[in-house]
Structure formats: C-alpha cells, structure tokens
Regions:
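N-terminal beta1-alpha1-beta2 submodule of the flavodoxin-like/Rossmannoid cofactor-binding fold
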Residues: 1-80, 87-89, 94, 98, ...
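Structural signal for conserved beta-strand scaffold positions within catalytic alpha/beta enzyme cores
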Residues: 32, 109, 136-139
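Redox-cofactor binding/interface segments in oxidoreductases and associated redox assembly factors
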Residues: 80-81, 109
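A short helix->loop->beta-strand "cap" motif at the edges of active sites that frequently abuts
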Residues: 103-106, 131-132
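Short beta-alpha junction loops
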Residues: 111-116
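Short, aromatic/basic amphipathic alpha-helical patches
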Residues: 120-129
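Glycine-rich phosphate/pyrophosphate-binding loop and the adjoining helix
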Residues: 133-156
C-alpha cells in the first residue's frame, strides 16, 4: 500500500494520461473520479451557455461521483488531478473531496489546460477539504518524467 494516492477526473483522457504517469513517478495508488452520469461531447461544449459543463460552473453544484475510494484513511498525500474549466476545477472535484475526512492530509492539486493556469483553483477547492493542507499545485501539460519527479519533490 502506498502512502500517496493520485485521484483524477478526466473528461477527455488528457488528465488520465498525466495522472497515470504521476502515479508511477510518485509510487502512488491511482483512483479515477468517475461521474455517475458520463459526460458527452455536447456536455463539454464550453461555447454553449446551456451545456452541462457550463451549468456546473455554479459553485454550489455537486455532480454525483459513481464510486468512492474505500481506503482513503490509508493515505497521507492525495494528489488531485483535473482539467481546468473556467479557471477552476470542475465541481465534481469538490464532490470528491467533500466525500472524505481529509483532515491532516496533504492535498496536491494538478491540472491540465489548453491555456489557463491554476488561477483561483486552490482557493476554490480548500473549503471542500477543511483541515487538509493544500500545496500550490501546478498545470502539468506535456511534462517530462523529470518535471513530474520535481513536482513530487516540491509538493512533499
């Protein structure tokens, strides 16, 4: 059993690839945050003001997650990965964090994005994990294993 977990939400598969590599580099277990209702291409159309992803921008929105990590208590560090949607994490990440008591754990956000940085992401996630310590996190687009190793060291 690893002391670290890499949990990730990936709508298109891009975050999944980074999460798998990060888990390998960090020697961490891997958990996919799967929505109870899968996203379609239409759901992800950010140009449509009525698309699901646009409606879920509401900070109070909590999309349901299909499964839980049964052994969260075993981990000291939880890396949480996601795409950046409108400068923050998708609200399903808040749903995931709120499902656990993360007090005393280190939460390390990581993201990928077509052009956004972390922005207000960490500030928006902190209320969902009271008592956890948050690292600054980073956007990990197309990074090398050496960069992932440096990210893990910097997040320790």
């Amino acid at each position: 059993m690893s002391e670290s977990l890499v949990a990730y939400f990936s709508a298109s598969g891009s975050t999944r690839k980074v999460a798998q590599r990060l888990a390998k580099v960090a020697g961490a277990d891997l958990f996919e945050i799967v929505p109870e209702r899968p996203y379609t291409a239409a759901d992800l159309d950010w140009t449509d003001r009525n698309s699901r992803s646009t409606r879920e921008r509401d900070p109070k929105c909590r999309p349901a997650v299909a499964s839980t990590c049964d052994n969260m208590a075993d981990y000291d560090t939880v890396y949480v990965g996601f795409p950046i949607w409108w400068y923050v994490a998708p609200t399903i990440v808040n749903t995931f964090l709120e499902a656990y008591d993360l007090s005393g754990k280190r939460v390390v956000p990581f993201a990928n994005s077509g052009g956004s940085r972390m922005g207000a992401t960490v500030a928006a996630l902190k209320p969902s994990a009271p008592g956890a310590t948050f690292a600054a996190g980073d956007v990990l687009n197309g990074v090398s294993d050496a960069k992932l190793e440096a990210f893990v060291r910097a997040s320790a």
